From Swiss-Prot:
UniProt source species: Pseudomonas entomophila (strain L48)
Disulfide feature: none
Top-level enzyme category: ligase
UniProt-listed SUPFAM superfamilies: GatB/YqeY motif, Glutamine synthetase/guanido kinase
Listed EC numbers: 6.3.5.-
NCBIfam families reported for this sequence: gatB, PRK05477.1-2, PRK05477.1-4, PRK05477.1-5
Record carries keyword Nucleotide-binding: yes
Catalytic activity: L-glutamyl-tRNA(Gln) + L-glutamine + ATP + H2O = L-glutaminyl-tRNA(Gln) + L-glutamate + ADP + phosphate + H(+); L-aspartyl-tRNA(Asn) + L-glutamine + ATP + H2O = L-asparaginyl-tRNA(Asn) + L-glutamate + ADP + phosphate + 2 H(+)
Assembly information from the UniProt record: Heterotrimer of A, B and C subunits.
Ranges annotated as spanning the membrane: none
Protein name listed in UniProt: Aspartyl/glutamyl-tRNA(Asn/Gln) amidotransferase subunit B
GO molecular function: asparaginyl-tRNA synthase (glutamine-hydrolyzing) activity; ATP binding; glutaminyl-tRNA synthase (glutamine-hydrolyzing) activity
Amino acid sequence: MQWEVVIGLEIHTQLATQSKIFSGSATTFGSEPNTQASLVDLGMPGVLPVLNQEAVRMACMFGLAIDAEIGPRNVFARKNYFYPDLPKGYQISQMDLPIVGKGHLDIALEDGTIKRIGVTRAHLEEDAGKSLHEDFNGATGIDLNRAGTPLLEIVSEPDMRSAKEAVAYVKAIHALVRYLGICDGNMAEGSLRCDCNVSVRPKGQVEFGTRCEIKNVNSFRFIERAINSEIQRQIDLIEDGGKVVQETRLYDPNKDETRSMRSKEEANDYRYFPDPDLLPVVIEQSFLDSVRAALPELPTQKVERFQSQYGLSAYDANVLASSREQADYFEQVVSIGGDAKLAANWVMVELGSLLNKLGVEIDQSPVSAEQLGGMLLRIRDNTISGKIAKTVFEAMAAGEGDADSIIESKGLKQVTDTGAIDKMLDEMLAANAEQVEQYRAADEAKRGKMFGFFVGQAMKASKGKANPGQVNQLLKAKLEG
């Protein structure tokens, strides 16, 4: 039997506000446990929550960016459940009237096609605290620094049909919230976490299968592995005559499998009701207009501009626009170096390889955009060849200065003197007289392969400094003259 996979995602993004959503406590990551928890965060009696307007503004930014409906009147509700790191015994969230309604996000698939993923809603809520199990023998510690941190929970439609589509969607959300500046996207620190709802159904069946939710997956690689593992588990279970039970599961990356955590709750299990301590939030058109006016260029807009303005392929444009920092770096290189396609190649290949090797992001690059742009200028004016440029790039990465100083100190300037190249070629051809005769006796097809040998010998003789274009032109004339 052929199976179809159905995936919907809930992405929890920690908003980059200076203070928490309902209190004045700081949201700095990594502080000593319980040093950023006020009486409001601790759930002490007699204290009242006060809504952080910046969190509302950020939620509206996201909603406008995905062309979503923004609720003119939205309500905060109490989501009731017990857990040790939830001090009030309820979480302040949104249910019936969320701040962001239906929207959509377009994702680029591996084959270059674009798929539209629906967004059901995005609502504001407070994060819970954190249970610490490792440092306490036979006990659990509670850190409430995270309690009350503003979250925007982004709920997708069940529109994804493979783990790769799901990862592409999460990457698109990740890029978008970073572009907007509303979340740092640091998955290792929990700034962006994903719950994956997975089900399978026979190909052609309209009704959805029974779904299972995989909680708190925090890397792109684990999202793909967790979903694929759960897909296979469900298919194996059904084909063996069993039934999928709706439940919440956890992904174990060491065993590459999901395991049952608890039965899946429905909304009525949480007994949602409007929070009496918080008034309904009314979002006026003037507020929305001010938010819209402050929106930056979005990833999809940047991709389109990179293609039209710089003549880049869709693939190159998508790669370069995958993060705001990389896009800005690329444009800075182009503004200095001039050649967009050359800049794109160096940023994606050579710089990308260097950053991967060092394990750093582009904003920590040892080679600045000014340095790389300056080096590309020297390629374009024939001061150095592309091959020599790699030596210059390595020296810049090692902190030896800019391109001009490195070219000067290492004597890397390209030989462009026609007379000098002509003399060098004569000496090289004389030393390879037998190969010259073979070349002249060969047919056109064989000559193409043999010509590369002479080019290689010429570059070797010049220690890579001869201008390759001049070498090719003069060499062809000598061999066929």
